[in-house]
UniProtKB/Swiss-Prot annotation:
It catalyses: XTP + H2O = XMP + diphosphate + H(+); dITP + H2O = dIMP + diphosphate + H(+); ITP + H2O = IMP + diphosphate + H(+). Mg(2+) binds at residue 68. Substrate binds at residues 7-12, 69, 154-157, 177, 182-183. GO terms for molecular function: dITP diphosphatase activity; ITP diphosphatase activity; metal ion binding; nucleotide binding; ribonucleoside triphosphate phosphatase activity; XTP diphosphatase activity. It comes from Albidiferax ferrireducens (strain ATCC BAA-621 / DSM 15236 / T118) (Rhodoferax ferrireducens). This is dITP/XTP pyrophosphatase. HAMAP family: Non_canon_purine_NTPase. Transmembrane segments: none annotated. Belongs to the HAM1 NTPase family. NCBIfam families: RdgB/HAM1 family non-canonical purine NTP pyrophosphatase (TIGR00042).
Length: 199
């Protein structure tokens, strides 16, 4: 079965392809089908993910999977949250992973409470009008490191220090990261839901 990923993010595509491989789904990006990105006007991950999944399904006629994910920093009241991808732009930088990390470290320079969570919300729909979307959430709590460490992953992986490993996500082998990441946890829950309700 073909499923459209409501994203053009290559990092997300690679992770989700690997995680959904056991079901035999062919995951293709919306960009491959010429589908524009959906607006994300909401304040919660689940609302944005649902809007993106419905948008991709409406434009493709195929089932769709969307991920809305972000970093929620305790010292910032849970922000940047759904605005994570654009975090750097608030501080005069261009949008991008490296700039997001740079801006975060600058804003947290004198902050002692470094607790943060990476959150991934996956939503899958069979069609644009699917009355029963599948919703899976994964969450990992860690601490923001004082400097980037590691060369794997993307996003905030180089500064997301995971206490049980004593390393950032970017230092962990890909298999270990995927098994323990917010997206990995959400994908495992989504796999179970898809097996139960779609297969």
């Amino acid at each position: 079965m073909k499923i459209v990923l409501a994203s053009n993010n290559r990092g997300k595509l690679a992770e989700l392809r690997a995680m959904l491989a056991p079901l035999g789904f062919e995951l293709i990006t919306q960009g491959e089908l010429g589908i524009p990105e959906a607006p994300e006007p909401y304040h919660t991950f689940v609302e944005n993910a649902l809007a993106k999944a419905r948008h991709a399904s409406a434009h493709s006629g195929l089932p769709a999977l969307a991920d809305d994910a972000g970093l929620c920093v305790d010292a910032f009241g849970g922000l940047p949250g759904v605005q994570t991808a654009f975090y750097a732009t608030r501080f005069g930088y261009e949008k991008g992973d490296d700039n997001n990390v740079r801006a975060l470290l600058e804003q947290m320079r004198d902050v002692d409470n470094r607790r943060a969570a990476l959150v991934s919300t996956l939503v899958a729909v069979r069609s644009e009008q699917d009355p029963e979307p599948l919703i899976a959430v994964g969450r990992v709590v860690g601490e923001i490191a004082r400097a980037p460490v590691g060369s794997h992953g993307f996003g905030f992986d180089p500064v997301m220090l995971i206490p049980e490993f004593g390393q950032t996500f970017a230092q962990l082998p890909v298999e270990v990261k995927n098994a323990n990441s917010h997206r990995g946890r959400a994908a495992r829950a989504m796999l179970a839901l898809m097996r139960e309700r779609w297969l």
